[in-house]
């Protein structure tokens, strides 16, 4: 994490120099200019502050974008903390004002129930990605291409679907829509965590075994593993979604500059995958240096986020 201390610079203009022949009006003008300079500098110093960004456990784009904005905001005078929690805890925390910002709200499907519950207590800042999708993925050489064919191929996959966190929207969609629609009630649906799912995926591919996993795009796994999405002819996984940044109520008023930057933020899949891949395998204690190196390699784009 980044723990730089925000430094405020206040400029004090001294108007004590009296020149021979200067009128009192000149003196007053000098004092007024000094007051204006001090006031402007104080306003600049107040742009920073303490912020808490909430990160969804196991959601790689949540981690990547939060680490990115932690670095950007701290470079611009803020002191930033990251707090990790499951979605239900995060939405409650943002509504209660315990967290300032969450960058990974999927709409209109995945997190719709949370917006229904907390939407009038939080602020929408804007979407930064508009082609996100929930997916069911398999190894690229798997004997099926569609969810409609999966039930008949149970022996090929051991009758198992490997999922992520129990409280995830993707998990609920898989359990409530995908499984009953495609006749997969007899399959074992395993939920634990995203890292556990990715570990099973890695192991299966290394061993040349078939595997079914719940996944989503954007995700670095699509660049790292030879996998394909199963077609969803019944549309159980929904249409493409947007990834939206939300903040606690009053955030835009309290931190107008940060709110403007976050509202204007967009990031394409190529940049996101690259940052996520750089973070994969890194210890949390190394995140600062990993993100700093990535920012240096993409400095022009990063600078544009606060231009």
PLM regions: where:
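Short helix-initiation/N-cap motifs at beta->coil->alpha
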Residues: 57-60, 82-93, 188-200
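Short, polar/charged alpha-helical segment
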Residues: 60-79, 179
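A conserved helix-loop-strand patch within extracytoplasmic ligand-binding domains
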Residues: 119-167
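Bacterial lipoprotein signal-peptidase II cleavage site
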Residues: 6-7, 19-42
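A bilobed periplasmic-binding-protein/Venus flytrap-type ligand-binding module shared by bacterial periplasmic
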Residues: 133-143, 241-256
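Short, well-ordered beta-strand elements
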Residues: 46-61, 78-83, 158-162, 262
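Ligand-binding pocket segment of bilobal, Venus flytrap-like solute-binding proteins
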Residues: 99-103, 166-169, 173-235
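Bacterial N-terminal signal peptides that target proteins for export
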Residues: 1-9
């Amino acid at each position: 994490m980044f723990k730089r201390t925000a430094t405020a610079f206040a400029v004090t203009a001294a108007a004590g120099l009296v020149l021979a022949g200067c009128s009192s009006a000149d003196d007053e003008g000098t004092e007024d200019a000094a007051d204006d300079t001090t006031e402007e500098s104080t306003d600049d110093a107040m742009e920073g502050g303490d912020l808490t960004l909430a990160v969804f456990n196991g959601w790689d784009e949540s981690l990547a974008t939060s680490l990115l904005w932690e670095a950007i905001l701290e470079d611009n005078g803020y002191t930033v903390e990251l707090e990790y929690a499951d979605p239900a805890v995060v939405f409650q925390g943002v509504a209660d004002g315990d967290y300032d910002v969450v960058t990974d709200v999927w709409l209109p499907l995945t997190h719709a129930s949370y917006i229904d519950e907390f939407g009038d207590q939080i602020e929408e800042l804007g979407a930064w990605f508009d082609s996100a999708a929930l997916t069911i993925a398999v190894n690229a050489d798997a004997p099926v291409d569609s969810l409609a064919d999966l039930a008949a191929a149970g022996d090929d996959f051991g009758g198992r679907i490997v999922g992520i966190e129990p409280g995830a929207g993707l998990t609920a969609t898989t359990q409530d829509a995908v499984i009953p629609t495609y006749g997969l009630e007899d399959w074992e649906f395993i939920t634990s965590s995203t890292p556990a799912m990715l570990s099973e995926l890695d192991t299966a591919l290394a061993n040349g075994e078939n595997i079914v996993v719940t996944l989503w795009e954007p995700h670095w796994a699509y660049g790292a593993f030879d996998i394909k999405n199963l077609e969803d002819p019944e549309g159980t996984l929904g249409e493409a979604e947007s990834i939206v940044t939300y903040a606690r109520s009053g955030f835009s008023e309290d931190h107008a500059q940060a709110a403007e930057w976050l509202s204007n933020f967009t990031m394409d899949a190529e940049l996101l995958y690259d940052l996520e891949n750089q973070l994969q395998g890194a210890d949390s204690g190394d995140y600062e240096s990993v993100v700093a190196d990535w920012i240096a390699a993409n400095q022009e784009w990063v600078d544009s986020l606060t231009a």
